[in-house]
Amino acid sequence: MKRSLSGIQPSGILHIGNYFGAMKQFIDLQDDYDGFYFIADYHSLTSLTKAETLKENTYNIVLDYLAIGLDPNKSTIFLQSNVPEHTELTWLLSNITPVGLLERGHSYKDKIAKGIPSNTGLLTYPVLMAADILIYDSDIVPVGKDQKQHLEMTRDIAMKFNQQYEVEFFKLPEPLILDDSAIVPGTDGQKMSKSYNNTINMFATKKKLKEQVMSIVTDSTPLEEPKNPDNNIAKIYALFNNIDKQNELKEKFLAGNFGYGHAKTELLNSILEYFGKAREKREELEKDIDYVKYVLNEGSKKTRAIAIEKINKAKEIVGLIGNIY
């Protein structure tokens, strides 16, 4: 079975845009691939500076993924920082990676343009990402179109290592481009993103979830008048309902005497129904953090055994003599 690897940054609370953009597809993949899913806590240090926030986010991300269906019996879930061989390999790869390659990174240039202070971690982010992928001989890496360049850089780094040391050591991973056709609009109509503060969080309390849904921006068409059915509420509603339900909502908008508030209530109910079992499961998992720790520890043991074997071979290739005691 081919191996799939995905990194999940604990950078904040997950929302329905994350779910339909990547999470759901990760879950669907686990029946067909040997899935490795790691919490990219080292990567998150390029943007998170508060220790308590990182700790809280890390547990929350694991809870979210377990709740929506990531199965530890099918997939391996682990912490990046629990496998120090990632950073060991990063150093080996750093010595054959041109600085110019890193400076041309779209993500790096975009963050600098936004005024984010440049530091070594931000610049060398793709080298650590390459190590994350290459150390497990990953066959595929599910990525969005905006992340494809990072995987291309991983392939470039792997090829350069293989060429420099005249070996066929690192497998060249293939991208599995995630379907982003269902771009989820946020409450303000832009793409849903934590950066825009326009998210709807599927695991929020019912009160908070209602506040988020009710904050969806609409026009000022009076209650009694027909409304354009191609609106934000309808677009989000379509993610949770079949075509018949979508057509029913459309007819209500066109008929008039159906307000946006009514539509938002129907959307809220759809979200609660869709994520009902996941919300219940998450509440149960919150009461059993020891189980969450167990899942992470077991995953880290498994992956570290693989990583140790790979890094030892890499050290031998570059001429490091290893343990002499």
PLM regions: where:
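Conserved nucleotide- and phosphate/pyrophosphate-binding catalytic cores
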Residues: 18, 149, 155-325
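Short catalytic-loop micro-motif centered on adjacent basic/acidic residues
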Residues: 76-79, 142, 221
